[in-house]
Amino acid sequence: MVESVIGIVVICVLIFLLTALFGAPYVPTQRKQIESAFSKLRPFKKNDVLVDLGSGDGVVLYEAIRAGASKVIGYEINPILVLISCLRLRSNRGRFTIFWRSFWRINAPSDVSIVYAFGESRDIKKMYDLVQKWSNRSGREIDFISYGFEVPGFNHSKKENAHFLYNIAPLHSQKT
């Protein structure tokens, strides 16, 4: 029995360590900061769809629904966190989708209006560029909320605590 528990703990620790190699480590976001970002930085409009890049335990998705998002979509590579997210959001059936996969190779849903990301300083510019590609393809502006890091080389339009808002407009002259 003890060996089984130790084995499960070791597997869980390994999953968290391995997923941290491919992206940002899991750091829970404070609910109060998320609430503040969604009320002061970028309040939701009626048909807003939020995509969370590296959705972790689903707290951002949950708070986005509470704040008025019509739909939320999360991408997470840690299967344990995907399960926790699904459990957290189970009362919101039909308003959330969580994918167990990397977001780097996905095409954004056509109706995405807000992208939320906590990325390490080495990745946040690449995430911004990914959202710029999505904006170019859709021909629509997408608001990008970065938690914890500013995007180097770009000016944010607003800041609330550790959240930075960027309004990404399509660049029609670029090929995507």
What does each of the following model-derived ranges do?
Residues 71-76:
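Conserved SAM-binding motif I beta-strand of class I
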Residues 85:
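Conserved SAM-binding loop
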Residues 122-134:
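A short, conserved alpha-helix within the catalytic core of class I
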Residues 1-45:
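S-adenosyl-L-methionine
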Residues 92-103:
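Conserved SAM-binding strand-loop segment of SAM-dependent methyltransferases
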Residues 139-150:
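Conserved beta-strand signature within the Rossmann-like core of class I S-adenosyl-L-methionine
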Residues 57-69:
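Conserved SAM-binding loop of SAM-dependent methyltransferases across substrates and taxa
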Residues 46-56:
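Conserved class I S-adenosyl-L-methionine
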